[in-house]
């Protein structure tokens, strides 16, 4: 619907050229197509108005609705929001600038911003007035109303271009002031840091000798302490090794004693089982031999 309404405000103004002498076409600024967000938003606003000028009589009833005014209001708000956002971005860079200069630039920029907003407001009001006149007609033909609207819009467009260019220039001054203020701030910081570095260098040169002596004394003490700790660690390590060796010997002795004890327990048992097994085999063999009949001889 927004696209349809956008097509609505640009055809009407083009159709207004029937009975009036066409005025030279004002070229669209290049920045409206590839500039700051607010410039792009302003370009969309006027593209919408130009689109309305291209509408034919068949869509006039669509133009009479309030949708066109609402669409223009949204485009106006988008443009002014983008201007405010860009201005706020520049204000962040104006911190190092003098307060009086900053206040003056801000005041001039607000005035230019207000003029541009008033221009867009007048375009919207002119379309609303045209809608009311079309409804009442007031003894005039539709072509006369369209021609008069086209003339007013061309004048408003020229004024808007002039005020937009003025706003661009003031924003550029605002930005240049921010850059200069930032550069002055950086220069002051650089000078201050240079002074501090020089003072630190002189102070370090004056105190370097005592510090070197203290560092050497601390290094000597630290080396002595490290030697002492290393000797203690070696003694402790040797002591631990001896203790581990004693533990190993005790474990081996206990293992041998346990093995001998197990052998003493199981050998008699195994010998007894072997003897019982041999007796059992002899008994089985004897029983088998007794139960086998003697072979008989045939006569």
From Swiss-Prot:
Q: In this chain, where does the modification Phosphoserine occur? A: 141
Q: Which domain of life is it from?
A: Eukaryota
Q: Name one Pfam family in it.
A: Apolipoprotein
Record-level Gene Ontology MF annotations: cholesterol transfer activity; heparin binding; phosphatidylcholine-sterol O-acyltransferase activator activity; phospholipid binding
Q: Where is this region: Lipid-binding and lipoprotein association?
A: 205-273
User: What ranges does the record give for the region 8 X 22 AA approximate tandem repeats, renumbered to this chain?
Assistant: 74-245
Coiled coil residues, start to end: none
Which residues are annotated with the PTM Methionine sulfoxide?
Answer: 137
A Gene Ontology cellular-component term: multivesicular body, internal vesicle
Q: State the oligomer form and interacting partners.
A: Homotetramer. May interact with ABCA1; functionally associated with ABCA1 in the biogenesis of HDLs. May interact with APP/A4 amyloid-beta peptide; the interaction is extremely stable in vitro but its physiological significance is unclear. May interact with MAPT. May interact with MAP2. In the cerebrospinal fluid, interacts with secreted SORL1. Interacts with PMEL; this allows the loading of PMEL luminal fragment on ILVs to induce fibril nucleation.
What's the family?
Answer: Belongs to the apolipoprotein A1/A4/E family.
Question: What name appears for this protein in its UniProt entry?
Answer: Apolipoprotein E
| Origin species | Tympanoctomys barrerae (Plains viscacha rat)
């Amino acid at each position: 619907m927004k696209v349809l309404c956008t097509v609505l405000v640009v055809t009407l103004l083009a159709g207004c050229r029937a009975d009036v002498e066409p005025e030279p076409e004002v070229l669209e600024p290049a920045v409206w197509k590839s500039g700051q967000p607010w410039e792009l938003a302003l370009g969309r606003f006027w593209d919408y108005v130009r689109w309305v000028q291209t509408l034919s009589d068949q869509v006039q009833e669509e133009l009479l609705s309030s949708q066109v005014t609402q669409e223009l209001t949204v485009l106006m708000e988008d443009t002014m929001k983008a201007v405010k956002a860009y201005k706020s971005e520049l204000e962040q860079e104006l911190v190092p600038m003098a307060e009086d200069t900053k206040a003056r630039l801000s005041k001039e920029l607000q005035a230019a911003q207000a003029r541009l907003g008033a221009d867009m407001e007048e375009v919207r009001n002119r379309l609303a007035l045209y809608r009311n006149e079309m409804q009442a007609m007031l003894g005039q033909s539709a072509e006369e109303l369209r021609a008069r609207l086209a003339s007013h819009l061309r004048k408003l467009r020229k004024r808007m271009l002039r005020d937009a260019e003025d706003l661009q220039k003031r924003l550029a001054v605002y930005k240049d002031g921010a850059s200069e203020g930032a550069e002055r701030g950086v220069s002051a910081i650089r000078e201050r840091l240079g002074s501090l570095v020089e003072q630190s260098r002189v102070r370090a040169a004056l105190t370097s000798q005592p510090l070197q002596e203290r560092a050497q004394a601390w290094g000597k003490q630290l080396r002595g302490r490290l030697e002492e700790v290393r000797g203690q660690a070696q003694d402790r390590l040797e002591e631990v090794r001896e203790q581990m060796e004693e533990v190993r010997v005790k474990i081996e002795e206990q293992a041998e004693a346990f093995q001998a004890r197990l052998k003493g327990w199981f050998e008699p048992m195994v010998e007894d089982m072997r003897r019982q097994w041999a007796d059992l085999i002899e008994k089985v063999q004897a029983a088998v031999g007794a139960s086998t009949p003697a072979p008989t001889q045939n006569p």
